[in-house]
UniProtKB/Swiss-Prot annotation:
InterPro entries: Aldolase_TIM, Methyltransferase_A, RlmN_N, RNA_MTrfase_RlmN, rRNA_lsu_MTrfase_RlmN/Cfr, rSAM. SUPFAM superfamilies: Radical SAM enzymes (SSF102114). Belongs to the radical SAM superfamily. RlmN family. Its EC number is 2.1.1.192. This is Probable dual-specificity RNA methyltransferase RlmN. HAMAP family: RNA_methyltr_RlmN (MF_01849). GO terms for molecular function: 4 iron, 4 sulfur cluster binding; metal ion binding; rRNA (adenine(2503)-C2-)-methyltransferase activity; rRNA binding; tRNA (adenine(37)-C2)-methyltransferase activity; tRNA binding. Pfam families: Radical_SAM, RlmN_N. GO terms for cellular component: cytoplasm. [4Fe-4S] cluster binds at residues 125, 129, 132. The gene is rlmN. S-adenosyl-L-methionine binds at residues 175-176, 207, 230-232, 306. The lineage of its organism: Bacteria, Bacillati, Bacillota, Bacilli, Bacillales.
C-alpha cells in the first residue's frame, strides 16, 4: 500500500539504519568504536552477502555480545514480495514492499551470458518523461543504499533455489539514479566489493536522463562502470517534448558533459533511444541522430517500447525499427536493437507498481 501515512510515520520512528548500507570500511570503523577487531567486518559481510542470512542469530562465528550490538544498531533489510511475475522467456518481475508501505520494482533478466538484474533507486520519479510509467504519481522518496542492495540480495536468494547467480546489473529501474547520487555510489561500491556481492564493475551499468552536474562528478569517480544516457531524441525541441528535463539541461550542454566524461575516463557511453511510433522513429530522425553523435565514442541501443496504458505512445512497426537501425549503420554509428524481454508481463518500467497503486485506490 502507498496511502498508509500513519504507518509510514510509525515505521520511520522505529527504523534502525540498514546494515546493507555500510561499506566494508564503514563496518570496520563501527567495529572499532565498539571495541571489536576490524577483521569481524569480513565475517559479517560473508554472512550477509555469501550466506545471505536474515537474522544475526545465524552469524554463529560472532560472539553473542557482538550479535546483540549489531541487532541493536542495524536492521537486516528485508523486502516483502507483493507480486512476482514470470515471463515465458524467463524474465521475472518483482514488486517489493518497503518498511514504510511503499513499493518498488526489480527485474531479473536471463541472457545467454548470465543473469542480469535491473534495480530501482527511488520510490517514484520526478523527471516526468512523457512515455514512462515510473513518473506516474511523482517522487515519494529516495531509497537508501541498503534498500537498493537488498533488491540484489532478495533476487539472489530466489536464484539460490536453482543454483544460479546474479552476474550483472543495470541501474535502470524506477527513479533517476543521479537524483540519489550518494546512496547510488555506496550501493555500487558494496555490490562491486569482493567481500560484498562481488559483481565486476564492467558488468554494471548506470543510466541517467541527463543531470549534467552529476555527469561531471561521475566522471571523477574511480569506477570502471558502464555509463548510459537516456537520449530518445536527436534534437532539443523533440527531446524537451519527450523528456521535460531537457528544458533544464539542454541537449548541447548534455553532449558537452558526455564528451568530457569520455575524455576523462576513456570509456564508451551508450545512448538509449526508445522508438515511439510517429514521434522519433523516422529516417530523418536517424540521420539527425547520426549527425549529433558524429565523432562521439558511443553505442546506440534502440529500444522497441513496451505499451503503457496510461501513456499515448504506440510501438514502432518492426520494419521501421530495422530501417532506423540500417540508417544509423550506414552512417557509421555502432547500433543494436535491444532484445525484448518480459513482453507478456507488466514489463515497462514502473508499470507493475502503477497497476498495484491503481488497484489500491479502487
Amino acid at each position: 500500500m502507498e496511502t498508509t501515512t500513519r504507518k509510514q510515520k510509525k515505521a520511520l520512528e522505529t527504523k534502525k539504519p540498514s546494515i546493507y548500507s555500510l561499506q566494508l570500511h564503514e563496518m570496520q570503523e563501527w567495529l572499532k568504536e565498539q571495541g571489536e577487531p576490524k577483521f569481524r567486518a569480513g565475517q559479517i559481510f560473508d554472512w550477509l552477502y555469501k550466506k545471505r542470512v536474515k537474522n544475526y542469530e545465524d552469524m554463529t562465528n560472532l560472539s553473542k555480545g557482538l550479535r546483540e550490538k549489531l541487532s541493536n544498531s542495524f536492521d537486516i533489510t528485508t523486502l516483502n514480495t507483493l507480486v512476482k511475475q514470470t515471463s515465458s522467456d524467463g524474465t521475472i518481475k518483482f514488486l517489493f514492499q518497503l518498511y514504510d508501505g511503499y513499493s518498488i520494482e526489480t527485474v531479473l533478466m536471463r541472457h545467454e551470458y548470465g543473469n542480469s538484474i535491473c534495480v530501482t533507486t527511488q520510490v517514484g520519479c520526478r523527471i516526468g518523461c512523457t512515455f514512462c510509467a515510473s513518473t506516474l504519481g511523482g517522487l515519494k522518496r529516495n531509497l537508501e543504499a541498503g534498500e537498493i542492495v537488498a533488491q540484489v540480495v532478495e533476487v539472489q536468494r530466489a536464484l539460490d533455489e536453482t543454483n544460479e547467480r546474479v552476474s550483472s546489473l543495470v541501474v535502470m529501474g524506477i527513479g533517476e539514479p543521479f537524483d540519489n547520487y550518494d546512496h547510488l555510489m555506496s550501493f555500487l561500491r558494496i555490490v562491486n566489493h569482493e567481500k560484498g556481492i562481488n559483481i565486476g564493475a564492467r558488468h554494471m551499468t548506470v543510466s541517467t536522463s541527463g543531470i549534467i552536474p552529476k555527469i561531471y562528478k561521475f566522471a571523477e569517480e574511480d569506477l570502471q562502470i558502464n555509463f548510459a544516457i537516456s537520449l530518445h531524441a536527436p534534437n532539443t525541441e523533440l527531446r524537451s517534448k519527450l523528456m521535460p528535463i531537457n528544458r533544464a539541461y539542454k541537449l548541447p550542454d548534455l553532449m558537452e558533459a558526455i564528451k568530457y566524461y569520455i575524455n576523462r575516463t576513456g570509456r564508451r557511453v551508450t545512448f538509449e533511444y526508445g522508438l515511439f511510433g510517429g514521434e522519433n522513429d523516422q529516417v530523418e530522425h536517424a540521420e539527425e541522430l547520426a549527425q549529433l553523435l558524429k565523432g562521439v565514442k558511443c553505442h546506440v541501443n534502440l529500444i522497441p517500447v513496451n505499451y503503457v496504458p496510461e501513456r499515448d505512445y504506440v510501438r514502432t512497426p518492426r520494419e521501421q525499427i530495422f530501417l532506423f537501425e540500417k540508417t544509423l549503420k550506414n552512417r557509421g554509428v555502432n547500433v543494436t536493437i535491444r532484445r525484448e524481454q518480459g513482453h507478456d508481463i507488466d514489463a515497462a518500467c514502473g508499470q507493475l507498481r502503477a497497476k498495484e497503486r491503481k488497484e489500491e485506490t479502487r
